[in-house]
Amino acid sequence: MTIKIHTEKDFIKMRAAGKLAAETLDFITDHVKPNVTTNSLNDLCHNFITSHNAIPAPLNYKGFPKSICTSINHVVCHGIPNDKPLKNGDIVNIDVTVILDGWYGDTSRMYYVGDVAIKPKRLIQVTYDAMMKGIEVVRPGAKLGDIGYAIQSYAEKHNYSVVRDYTGHGIGRVFHDKPSILNYGRNGTGLTLKEGMFFTVEPMINAGNYDTILSKLDGWTVTTRDKSLSAQFEHTIGVTKDGFEIFTLSPKKLDYPPY
């Protein structure tokens, strides 16, 4: 498997793309509240991205009909924005990918809708922490399995399950590239990380078991089979000489809710 190795100039491009993706999530934060539709959030994000001379990557990607993904409660990923209002107590993941100057910045965060119960709050916190545990093992010479192991062991320690069917991915001048970044695995196994690799780390963690269902109606929406809650966070990162760089950090330090 040949994995692209990027230059310092490429890092500069990815910093810009990642920053805009993060700024989009910063921008939308105050708009996520009860009675707002995910379609309205989609339109706001679309306009924000295009006003910054960028393109929302999901729109028309393999036929996806919207500019962002909005995944509510038991939706794991790839939820399609619609006209149904958000309800008090919902949790929602907003996943944004921008194309800026030909480079892709991909990130997602969880949001509370109004007053959220303690159980979903705990799931969200553990999911964020699991992502960061996975990112923190990244350095030249580490293995892909180290990332998955760090995420899986942390999530399972808190009695949650890690989705197997969807993964992180290589990224750069293409949306989804090699390698796949599994959110489960064994230490010391898999591809050896090298300086200059770019990829996403994006654990999807379920309160119940890890089985998922892909909607036969729209061909996109993924839900938990047991209808348990699911949470996800995502960062785009690069492997540096002595560790990692996160390209999609929030400029406003809105890392996880409450914001």
Curated annotation (Swiss-Prot):
GO terms for biological process: proteolysis. A divalent metal cation 1 binds at residues 95, 106, 234. A divalent metal cation 2 binds at residues 106, 169, 202, 234. Its cofactor is Co(2+); Zn(2+); Mn(2+); Fe(2+). Substrate binds at residues 78, 176, 220. One of its GO terms (molecular function) is initiator methionyl aminopeptidase activity. Monomer. This is Methionine aminopeptidase. It comes from Rickettsia prowazekii (strain Madrid E).
